[in-house]
């Protein structure tokens, strides 16, 4: 990705600077290519993004699929987007409908899909601008130069055949040295041979394209933001009426997933979704607040007494009609 090797390129950067998407792909590209970065506003506003593109004549636009969907929901005919040439997208899979609208409605002749984590920053897989729509919507591109990737059986660590699913592992200079002051967590994430365990379920095809299929752990991906259910669960446990709580991600057309809190109340207690949401407001990040609050009597359990979150997720989606 050389931005046409033109230092006069201007990039609209609405993605947060506390993620590698903004801090590394933004700052590094500015340092290496001499491009101009345009920050639409101090927070996030799809309208401010479009105003910045128009006033600053931006050529490239960064964003997650959700950010692009928000921009597409505005009255685009009010803005001059003729300067736009391309988009860089990451954070979560992009629905085909959004991809097509970006090309037709926002003048993005080229759209590049990227994948990476903060631990192997900034990206390890990247698509080609001229990839087919199928490759752009179903894969995250090919492995970057000087980086290795493999998909292994998480149970035994053996490499699985092409096309088969397993845990994606990454090795290269992009992999972090470790988590600050947390050697145990570092050992869990990076093996002795310096392979980083992404925790993602993925597959590689014969052309080297990677398809991300889900999370091994229970992480929720809401609009490109990674949310750990345990963090929300721990907070909700502090509510005096809550006996037990499990948080799962349920399907959402715009954000990919939404946070659903499944709560078992203390005996004799009553509550409401509004009460739980009010309890969360101002105490946890807005994007981590439960969108749905469902009160349950029990949870699906394994023979050993562990909660089957996959079955709980399915039950909640069915109950909510998703």
Task: Show where each model-derived region lies.
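Acidic/polar alpha-helix N-cap and adjacent early helical turns
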Residues: 314-322
């Amino acid at each position: 990705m050389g931005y046409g090797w033109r230092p006069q390129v201007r990039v609209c950067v609405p993605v947060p600077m506390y993620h590698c998407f903004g801090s590394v792909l933004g700052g590094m590209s500015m340092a290496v290519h001499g491009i101009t970065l345009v920050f639409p506003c101090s927070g996030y506003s799809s309208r401010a993004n479009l105003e910045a593109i128009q006033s600053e004549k931006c050529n490239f636009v960064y964003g997650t699929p959700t950010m692009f969907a928000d921009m597409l929901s505005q009255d685009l005919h009010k803005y001059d987007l003729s300067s736009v040439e391309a988009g860089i997208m990451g954070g979560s899979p992009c629905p085909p409908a959004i991809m097509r609208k970006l090309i037709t409605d926002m003048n993005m002749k080229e759209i590049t899909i990227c994948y990476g984590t903060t631990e192997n920053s900034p990206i390890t897989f990247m698509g080609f601008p001229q990839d087919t729509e199928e490759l752009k919507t179903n894969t995250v591109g090919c492995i970057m130069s000087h980086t290795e990737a493999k998909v292994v059986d998480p149970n035994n660590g053996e490499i699985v055949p092409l096309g088969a699913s397993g845990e994606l592992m990454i090795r290269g200079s992009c992999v972090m040295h470790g988590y600050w002051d947390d050697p145990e967590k570092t050992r869990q994430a990076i093996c002795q041979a310096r392979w980083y365990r992404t925790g993602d379920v993925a597959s590689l095809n014969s052309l080297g394209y990677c398809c991300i299929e889900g999370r091994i752990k229970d992480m929720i991906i809401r609009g490109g933001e990674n949310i750990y259910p345990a963090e929300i669960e721990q907070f909700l446990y502090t509510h005096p009426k809550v006996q037990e709580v499990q948080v799962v991600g349920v399907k959402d057309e715009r954000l990919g997933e939404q946070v659903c809190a499944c709560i078992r109340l203390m005996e004799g207690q009553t509550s409401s979704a509004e009460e739980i949401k009010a309890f969360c407001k101002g105490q946890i990040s807005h994007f981590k607040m439960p969108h749905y609050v469902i009160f349950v009597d029990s949870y699906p359990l394994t023979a050993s007494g562990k909660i089957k979150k996959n079955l709980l997720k399915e039950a909640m989606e069915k109950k909510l009609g998703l």
